Amino acid sequence: MENEYWKCSGHGTFVKAADGKDYYLYHAYNKKTNVFSGRQGMLAQLNWPAKNVWPVLKEKSGPSLNRDLKLNFTRPQIDKNWQWDFRNSTPGILQKNGQLHLSGIINKDNLSGIALTVRPTSTTFEATTTVTNTNSALKGLVYYGDAGSAIGIGIAGNEIEFWKVENKTRTVFAKVRIPTTVPVELKMKTADDLNLLVSFRKPNEEWQNVQAKEKITVNFLPQRDRSPRIGLLFNGSVSQDADFSTFELKY
């Protein structure tokens, strides 16, 4: 099935609802974000117009929901939206007293670190977090495709760092030394053309952009079945951790 908004539908399952109606639960790619945002869940009703004819699938639109996500880590249970790359790291995740503590073991060939992420429903979004601890590990935000394709902003010691990993090479676009360290808020914002802006601030102060020498795009991140995720980053030793008090994703 294809319409004005969706394409390449398939790989679905027929289900019967409590009211006796038949539905097709499947996936498709959004035409606007193309393969960058990956497959998304779809639902269509199965109708039989008459005997001995092909069935008809009619898409069903659900209610419009607020897709924004805001987490403050007040409960011990981690949010069900979190995902991580188990092939390239073994994260340790602890929520306590309004803090999420992220640590763990990073595979030797993993240059990106541990990424605790959620799957965005659009290529354009604004993600923010608050880092609350100080050490030499890099702690912050990451837009993560896999261990060899990621980009982010973080703080290590008293330096803000804007970085990416591509083709097994880690590049630092810019560093900004700040007089005091934590807490510090970090932000990543993507645009329709896949350009990326990153910034930081102390709580209740103005945002300061971290400028690279050229425009930075995220179009190198994996697509289709490995569509990139946005979330929290820890890149340090097993004796360190990254502490966060907030994470927010807005569309």
Whereabouts are the PLM-identified features?
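Carbohydrate-active catalytic/glycan-binding domains of CAZyme proteins
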Residues: 1-251
